[in-house]
Amino acid sequence: MNQTINLKGRSYLAEKDFSEEEILYLLDLAQKLKEKKAQGIRHRYLEGKNIALLFEKPSTRTRCAFTTACIDLGAHPEYLGKDDIQLGKKESIEDTAKVLGRMFDGIEFRGFEHEKVISLAEHSGVPVWNGLTDLWHPTQMLADFMTVKEHTGRVKGVKLTYIGDGRNNVANSLLIGGAKVGMDVRICSPQELFPDQDIVKMAEAFAEESGGKITVTSDTDKAVSGADVLYTDVWVSMGEEDKFAERIKLLKPYQVNMDLVKKTGNDNVIFLHCLPAFHDLHTTYGQNVYEQHGLKEMEVTDEVFRSKHSKVFDEAENRMHTIKAVMAATLGDLD
């Protein structure tokens, strides 16, 4: 682990703000913290700290990961849901940030507009961590790359194919994060759902520096050939439920099924998904989709989800370890 890296006092809002060395440092630190937890070694680097967890958007993994990370690090997490905070409704984000910064040592934010998390970081005076915005999902990216490294032994040069809605925050974070660390990132989606061109250009510039490669294509065969990692996400993001019929029509050819897995030509290819995944009918959501659209599986088939290729639960666990690394590195005393 690079001992010269010092992230103390930094906020973690988007991958573009961190160097390749800093991202790799966080991945190494996460691995060390995972080992400490497994061995029962205390690592209370945030002893006595108070952490605000702001959630405009509900979450299972992000909330649980930040909460358990806080407790393992010796901090006290305070959850504030959308009914507990104003954030521009009755109080400006700037004023809320200044108040929270007087009471808390660090702030996590999960919500919609990326500008809100930027404003919190600008005005609170404490480290702020992005648990998800419409634009980026940087803590997810770290968990993804930690899982990739655990199962392939590296991140540089890894061929990662994201297939599905290429405009969403996960695709954006994989593009920029992968470009930063020298991955061969392929985004495969229908042209209507290609990533924002400005983000693609940014990724291409970072890839040129790191030795990575960026491809955006609608050709599934080309995108998955030789892939080490197949990644997908939900076809309809939170707040877009009215677009179900349109998205199903667009994205059905981009479903991750066993035929697509075999087209990679890599028997050891791993499958990742940030979850929740709609791979069966064991949810109310899945039942509704089946009744309205006749689909039993959406972005990934149950066969792939439950196969040897699937590492989604390693990935989910790694949310905790990587979030812990971000918090410890930016707020703790690691000396």
Curated annotation (Swiss-Prot):
Superkingdom as given in the UniProt entry? Bacteria
Assigned protein family: Belongs to the aspartate/ornithine carbamoyltransferase superfamily. OTCase family.
Q: Per its database record, what is this protein's job?
A: Reversibly catalyzes the transfer of the carbamoyl group from carbamoyl phosphate (CP) to the N(epsilon) atom of ornithine (ORN) to produce L-citrulline.
Q: Which reaction does it catalyse?
A: carbamoyl phosphate + L-ornithine = L-citrulline + phosphate + H(+)
- UniProt GO cellular component terms: cytoplasm
- Which pathway, per its entry? Amino-acid degradation; L-arginine degradation via ADI pathway; carbamoyl phosphate from L-arginine: step 2/2
Q: Write down what this protein is called.
A: Ornithine carbamoyltransferase, catabolic
Q: Which UniProt keywords apply?
A: Arginine metabolism, Cytoplasm, Transferase
Report whether Transcription regulation shows up as a keyword of the record.
no
GO annotation, biological process: arginine biosynthetic process via ornithine; arginine catabolic process to ornithine; citrulline biosynthetic process; L-arginine biosynthetic process
The record's PROSITE patterns line, in alphabetical order, gives: CARBAMOYLTRANSFERASE
List residues binding L-ornithine.
N169, D233, S237, M238
The catalytic activity of this protein is classed by the Enzyme Commission as: 2.1.3.3
Which top EC class is named for this enzyme in its record? Answer: transferase
Subcellular localization is given as: Cytoplasm
- Organism, by scientific name, is Bacillus licheniformis (strain ATCC 14580 / DSM 13 / JCM 2505 / CCUG 7422 / NBRC 12200 / NCIMB 9375 / NCTC 10341 / NRRL NRS-1264 / Gibson 46)
Task: Kindly list the GO molecular function terms attached to this UniProt entry.
Answer: amino acid binding; ornithine carbamoyltransferase activity
* Binding-site residues, carbamoyl phosphate: S59, T60, R61, T62, Q86, R110, H137, P138, T139, Q140, C274, L275, R319
Has UniProt tagged this entry with the keyword Membrane? no
